[in-house]
Amino acid sequence: MKRSFLLLLTILTIFIILGQGVMGNDEQLRGNRCFQIKFKTGKCVPKECQTACQEKLRKPKLKGEGFCMKECTCCFYT
């Protein structure tokens, strides 16, 4: 009885640690690699946002995506 409880507790602990690691990596990939692009008009047009994002990322040769929320947000991936 005691061994099965310890085994169950060990497996549960490993599962929680691995789960937190996977969720942390996903958040780190999206959250830290996004930045805002401001336009003179103050309005975000999706096509202009995508073009501006690709222009900003052209020099370091990164792949990214621009999308509109309230402002143009550019996220890139390595």
From Swiss-Prot:
One of its GO terms (cellular component) is extracellular region. Keywords: Antimicrobial, Disulfide bond, Fungicide, Plant defense, Secreted, Signal. It is found in: Secreted. One of its GO terms (biological process) is killing of cells of another organism. Disulfide bonds join 34-75, 44-68, 49-72, 53-74. Residues 1-24 form the signal peptide. Belongs to the DEFL family. This is Putative defensin-like protein 133. The gene is LCR33.
